């Protein structure tokens, strides 16, 4: 089982920049299918000039995910996401979440690349403190 996040404004498409995203839809994906887990909404207001705090809130929202799909991400933010052991995947804006879920399910049903297999073998802690 793999937990993945999607930066979205409508719950249907990946259409948001990571640093501005206020909503992440979270799914569990396996070779057999996928299921929605929850929608996480960023509720803390962004303070002007506090890029670190803004990124911390978003990283915390997806901390239990192995992958976060997004429309855009800056270099510094990508490094911080990667350091949190989350793999950022940039996709064209308005890519359908359903197609990404099916593509990931298909990869998991075959022979996933080594970086993805490591995520399958390594449980992490969710924002609520429980394993993913």
Where are the regions a protein language model picked out?
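Mid-chain, well-packed structural core segment of small domains
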Residues: 59-91
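Non-catalytic interface/targeting segments
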Residues: 1-60, 64-65, 89-132
